[in-house]
């Protein structure tokens, strides 16, 4: 079972629930941020996009103090998979579960578009349904999605193979034009060192049906589901 965490201001929580339960036939439950424990039998945690607490102070800064985040941290420490998309990525960084930070987009405007992403590695539990070098197309919608980290942190991310997704051209080429927000290294998605926590700015939950944005999001969400079913 997957736990979809709901914060005040979340707006993609139901989309995530729909993608995982209705489209992929997984079992999901909504968990309010004031809860102090995850439901029994939780196999994965999903932190959705939106504007938790209205993005006051910094995106994710207040949400990371919610009671449920203590349980999320304990779950991650035990090796449980945690996925944060968009605002969920920001929350994971603020909570110290992922390195780096998400800053204002380099052009200082909100971006809403489809982007191409290059898969940098095939690994459980987030990319077992795809291959290294594969190109995914997913939507983005954010104003603070510029991934930033110190030079030392960036070096460690690359050295440890923690970069899972990069913004790219359709042919996989990395370019300034294909980077929608100025993220360092064109980084779109990063893992923790252990590989069980992933944050990404694009929205896989909005790309699970051919009639509505394509199905490339299944490569990520389906990989999580495969892990849960085999556990």
Tell me what each language-model feature is.
Residues 1-85, 93-99, 105-111, 118, ...:
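N-terminal beta1-alpha1 cap of cysteine-dependent amidohydrolase-like domains
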Residues 52-53, 89-91, 147, 171:
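Glycine-rich nucleotide phosphate-binding loop and flanking beta-alpha elements
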Residues 97-184:
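Pocket-forming structural segment of enzyme catalytic cores
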Residues 170, 205-207:
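Short Gly/Pro-enriched loop/turn and capping motifs at secondary-structure junctions
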Residues 200-204:
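Glycine-rich phosphate-binding loops of nucleotide-dependent enzymes
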Residues 117, 189-190:
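A structural signal for short hydrophobic beta-strand segments in well-ordered beta-sheet cores
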Residues 132-135, 192-197:
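Beta-strand-turn-beta hairpins that frame and shape the catalytic cleft
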